[in-house]
Each structure stands twice: as C-alpha cells, then as structure tokens.
Amino acid sequence: MKFLTALSAIGALVATATAAAVPNTPAKQSMIDVQLSATGNTMIKATITNKGDKALNLLQFNTILDKNPTRKVRVYQNGTEVKFTGMLPRYKMSNLSPEYFTSLGPKASVESTFDIARTHDLTRGGKITVMASGTIRTAEGHGANATTITGYARYESNKLELDVDAKKASSVGQAMGKVKKSRGTIDKRTNIDTSSCTQGQLDALEGALYNSAALAQAAAEAAPSNLNTVAEFFKSTSSSTVNTIVSRLQSVASESSYVDYGSTTYYCTDSMNGCSPGVLAYTLPDQNLIFNCPIYYSDLPALAQSCYEQDQATTTLHEMTHNSAVVSPFCDDLGYGYEDATSLSAAQAIQNADSYALFANGKLILHLHEKSGF
C-alpha cells in the first residue's frame, strides 16, 4: 500500500512564495445583511439581504443558508454556549454545482427558516440568546448559473433573545439522533467500525489516518520554528497560540495513530443520512463520530500533490479537529480554503478546522514511499 509521509528529518516548511499564486479574493464586508427573528418556540427565520448593486450567487455550504443540520447560529444561555448536536461537514470545493448556490439580486432578500431545537440541546428551556456570523462565498457573472468563486461576504446578525418552553423544545426530534455503535475490530488506528467498510474503503481510510498522523505530527514539530507561517494561518505568534496549535496537532496525530483504541469512532460509510451532495465527510462532535461519504473515495487523492488542494489525508485531519475528545473546544468551520481561512482573525483562526488542515497540507515537504504498515 502506498503512503505519503512528512520528512521528519527535515520537519520544515517551504517558502511562502506559493501563496502569491493564489488569486486575491476580495472580502465584501458589508454586502450581506442577516436579520434573525423568531417564528415559534425554537423556530428561527433568517432574512438574508444583498445590499449591493450586483446580483450574487451565494454558496450555501456552512452558512446560514446551508440545507444540512449544521451550526447556522450560536446559542447561548447564561453566558455559556448551548451544546450543539448537529453535523459539521467538509464539502468538496471544486467543480461546484449551481444547486449549491442561492441566487440573490441587487437589494433582494431571501428567507431561511430552521428549528434550533433540532441541532441544540434546549431541553432545559429558559432564556437564550441566538446570533449568527460567518462568511458566504460568492460567485458573480453568468446569472444564476455562476459557480466560479470570485469573492466572499462576511455577515453578523442581530442578537435574538428567546424564552424557550422546555416541554415544547424536548418534543422536537434531533436532526442527527444517536448512533448505535457496533464497532468491528482491526489491528490498528482509532476505532474504525469495520462493519461499515469494504476492503478498499478500509485500506483508503487506514492510509488517510496514517498520513493524517504524519502530517499533524510534522506540522506540530515545525510550528515553533516557523512563526511566519504560523502568523500566515493563525494571525498570531504568541506563545499561547503556538502552544495551542502544537497541542492540538499532536492530539490529532495521536488520535489518528492509536493502536486498538481511541476517543473517536470512524465509519467508512454513512449511516446517518448526512452525505448530501457535495459532502466529503462529516462529524457529529457531541458523539465523537466521523463518517466518510462516497465522494471521499471517488473524488479525492490520498494526498494532494499541490498546496491547498483537498485530499483524503487532510479531510480526515480536518474532521478530527471537529471532535471534542480530540480538540476542546472542538473546531468549527469558520473559513474554507486558503483565501477564506487566512482572512480570519486570530480568535477565529485558532478555532477553524481548515486552518489546521491547510497549515499541515500547504507548507510541509512530503515524501512518497512504499510502506506496508504503520
């Protein structure tokens, strides 16, 4: 079996010249307005308005417009964030289909309605605060069929105060539910449910975990002596930032390489109906479960041969950071891809899953060799 591993003897980062080749993607800071309102006990309506004078195609992935049970809003009670019970998907960002976009004309608005009780534990009821913030990637030109990303728009909603009826909230079914574990056994890696795998899928996942461990460990070792690159991806070189990055990457490396046990359970296939079009893999952070989707195997190489491209190894690394047993608090999807991730603030970047995946993927010197096991 072929595996890709970081050259541990070098443990260095390549020059940042490759970043110059990435097209500049302007942030339209005020192009999108998002207003939240309540339409029921836990039902939320988000009104998204294009404030500009050009039509926009808004990419739905990991935004307030996402059709999956993702983290569309933040919910707080008594100053503490309410437990999120939905899914955190990683989407394929190449060859985007028009169906992944919402078309919005100049000054036009679109509404999105969702029940936060389906993705949050609101069984206690009481007063809560709901807000939304994030980035929407935009495509311009060629009308409603535009799919080439040309920019991105940041948004921050109003704060919505609600008094939740606990009984009504408890009656709402959870979007993802609980997974009944029936783990198979293998000789190596974090808990893989082998009953969910074909031999080919198992081989691919074991290879991805091996590479995830190698990349994460090499990146952890390289970070303290490569502060310019740390600043590029995480916007800070403070000792606390570097220590957090190192600790989290080491945790990912450990979880990816545990023998016979681990804190997460990894499924080769989807048993929770989360693999909607465009989803490579997804995590249920409250249960520490990861699921691969069909296009993880069909559309991704084992490890990309150029910077910042998606692959199986860094998709697995990305998903590992979503698990609370690996990274606490678990990382979110605040910025996707190089341009978006490197435009985040320091506070956002340290909690962004793709920042770790890109840091590990984009700058490490790799070596391809034959290896039959870890």
Curated annotation (Swiss-Prot):
Gene3D superfamilies xrefs: 2.60.40.2970, Collagenase (Catalytic Domain)
Signal peptide, first to last residue: 1-19
GO MF entry, a single one: metalloendopeptidase activity
Binding residues for Zn(2+): H318, H322, D333
Main location: secreted
Catalytic residues (UniProt): E319
PROSITE patterns: ZINC_PROTEASE (PS00142)
Subcellular location: Secreted
Any one annotated GO CC term: extracellular region
Disulfide bonds: C197-C268, C275-C293
Co-factor binding details: Binds 1 zinc ion per subunit.
Any one biological process term the GO annotation gives: proteolysis
Reaction equations catalysed: Preferential cleavage of bonds with hydrophobic residues in P1'. Also 3-Asn-|-Gln-4 and 8-Gly-|-Ser-9 bonds in insulin B chain
Record has Secreted as a keyword: yes
Cofactor(s) named in the record: Zn(2+)
Signal keyword on record: yes
Name recorded for this polypeptide: Probable neutral protease 2 homolog ARB_00849
